[in-house]
């Protein structure tokens, strides 16, 4: 049986600067902490870094580690928050089905995002991550969604079809896996 304090999730947020990830992970390394999951994003010079940590083989204990992390966060001028996680939360991450919902169009407005996210929510599916994939004249966003049950991709695409026609955007739904990004199709019109 795992102890209830063997896993923690830390979240670092604040003004971005070089060395934040290096400083935080150096402390984790010195304490022999295993990183189970990690995600970082910087938006307009604001960093958000989250990690799920396995402390089962760490040195020094949870209190000492958290003290070191909080002091380093203060020195770096960022906020550090933590949550004690359970072993079950760690296992649940692996027992979910992931899908990618991609939206492409001239303009992807808040109304488009609201309609897509409402359709996803109506299926009791959670949006895990939203990423902008493009810059410039054409907009493209990708939502990685997670559910504890498999969904019918054709049914979900059908629900999103009305949004597609109402707002002049293209929406695709596909399973999220390692092979998804390697599929590419290039069409060249040589007649002109």
Report residues per predicted region.
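Asp-based phosphoryl-transfer active-site loop
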Residues: 184-192
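A conserved regulatory-domain signal marking ACT and ACT-like small-molecule sensing domains
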Residues: 1-184
